[in-house]
């Protein structure tokens, strides 16, 4: 990686939530952030739930987001890779964004090495012990048959229904009302601990686990690794940046360190 370049990570934009006007303001804020990243970006990782709902019908996609989609295309046209992970809200992302915006779609956990550091990146949904009801639902909705059946629902009805269900989601609530449950209760923290124990040889253990989904800004030291959660953009606007030496959680637009909600400050390793 070039000494002047950086890798950026963000998640949980939830574009489309809770209404057109509020979403548009958030979209413009995200575009400002992307334009800030572009001149110095080695790569940009968008780690799930970028859209509050997304479905690609045979001849149509959801209205809106044209500024955001155009910005993605402009960035990839410059040769800067954008890696997009589907989340639980936009798990039906398919090849439209690949063909029209040039993004690289990554559906599973992604591991990579940069400057001697190993990264493990995933949206975070369905990882760790428990949450069996969601894991079953994810398998059902991920099936081709589910997509096939949904496409026969008129878009006006299907998209409206999806947004209505989303507004009832616990994660649509203000994260200030939520809190970190501790390393022994948080599914993603448990996943990191279990994954670290399963990796052999030790030199293959990730240094950084980067997730979204939880809607909390987290920087947790677990054994030899750091677990970072990227926060959200519904009420906040946080992101992570790796400069080849250190990985930091920052707040946009101040670019100041984001306060970790597990009461642990950002640590450079």
Language-model features and meaning:
Residues 91-95, 121-122, 128-131:
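Short, well-ordered, mixed-charge alpha-helical segments that flank or form enzyme active sites
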Residues 102-107, 125, 130-137, 141-144, ...:
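Conserved beta-sheet core of the metallophosphoesterase superfamily
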Residues 11-14, 49-50, 88-89, 124-125, ...:
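Active-site metal-binding loops of divalent metal-dependent hydrolases
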Residues 258-269:
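Short, basic, low-complexity termini and linkers enriched in Ser/Thr/Gly/Pro
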Residues 124-191:
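Active-site-proximal loop/helix segment associated with metal-binding centers of metalloenzymes
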């Amino acid at each position: 990686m070039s000494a002047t370049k950086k890798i950026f990570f963000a998640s949980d934009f939830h574009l489309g939530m809770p209404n057109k006007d509020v979403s548009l303001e958030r979209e413009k804020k995200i575009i400002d952030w992307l334009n800030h990243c572009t001149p110095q970006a080695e790569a940009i990782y968008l780690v799930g739930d970028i859209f509050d709902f997304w479905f690609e019908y045979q001849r149509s996609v959801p209205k809106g987001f044209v500024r955001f989609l155009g910005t993605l295309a402009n960035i990839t046209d410059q040769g800067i890779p954008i890696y997009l992970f589907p989340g639980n809200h936009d798990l039906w992302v398919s090849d439209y964004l690949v063909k029209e915006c040039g993004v690289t779609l990554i559906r599973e956990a992604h591991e990579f090495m940069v400057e001697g550091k190993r990264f493990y990146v995933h949206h975070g949904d369905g990882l760790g012990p428990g949450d069996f009801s969601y894991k079953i639902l994810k398998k059902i909705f991920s099936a081709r048959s589910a997509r096939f059946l949904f496409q026969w629902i008129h878009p006006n009805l299907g998209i409206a229904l999806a947004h209505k269900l989303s507004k009832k989601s616990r994660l649509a609530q203000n994260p200030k009302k939520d809190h970190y449950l501790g390393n022994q209760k948080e599914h993603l923290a448990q996943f990191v601990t279990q994954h670290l124990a399963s990796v052999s040889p030790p030199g293959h253990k990730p240094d950084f686990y980067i997730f979204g989904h939880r809607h909390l800004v987290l920087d947790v030291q677990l054994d030899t690794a750091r677990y970072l959660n990227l926060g959200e953009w519904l009420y906040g606007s946080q992101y992570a940046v790796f400069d080849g030496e250190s990985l930091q959680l920052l707040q946009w637009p101040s670019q100041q360190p984001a306060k970790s909600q597990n009461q642990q400050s950002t640590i450079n390793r």
